[in-house]
Design a protein with these regions (language model features):
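HotDog/MaoC-like acyl-thioester-processing domains
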Residues: 1-12, 89, 94-155
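Hot-dog-fold acyl-thioester-processing enzymes
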Residues: 1-89, 154-155
């Protein structure tokens, strides 16, 4: 069994396991800055893509802490060390507006993983489910992220 096959099996065992994170309150200042950066007018509610785009409210990793593909070490606890990660699209459902002070809770789980063969070799397609809700459980955004994970290119 190849290393990629082993990773696939390890990720498959995690399907359905939910990790819950309290992201804390959303700040109007943060989502209004996001709106301006995205070319939208700032408003009283967060832009639709705000929650699915922000991994946390902190400053994030420094440039030297990023891997060569530009990702940090946030991989939802998956064993993806040594693999290159690429986004492969999102499906989003918007349920309720996000306003200043809304305390956001995120639940993350693996929904699916598939080992595929491409022209340049094998790769994994991983579907992650991220559900954002307020502290009372009211759904805000449901996000299905598709990721491609492939071995580092030979040097």
């Amino acid at each position: 069994m190849s290393t990629l096959e082993e990773v696939c099996e390890d990720v498959r065992k995690r399907i359905g396991t939910v990790t819950r994170d309290d992201l804390g309150p959303v700040s109007a200042r943060d989502f209004q800055r996001f709106a301006v950066a995205a070319g939208e007018p700032p408003g009283a509610t967060a832009p639709p893509l705000f929650l699915s785009s922000v991994l946390g409210w902190g400053a994030g990793p420094t440039g030297d802490a990023l891997s060569p593909d530009g990702t940090g070490d946030e991989t939802a606890g998956l064993p993806l060390d040594g693999l290159r990660l690429m986004g492969a699209g999102q499906d989003l459902d918007f349920h309720a507006p996000v306003r200043d002070g809304t305390r956001v809770v995120r639940e993350t789980s693996v929904e699916d993983v598939t080992l595929k063969q491409g022209g340049s070799g094998p790769f994994l397609v991983i579907t992650m489910l991220r559900m954002f809700a307020d502290e009372s459980g009211t759904p805000l955004v449901t996000c299905r992220d598709n990721l491609i994970a492939r071995p580092e290119a030979p040097r």
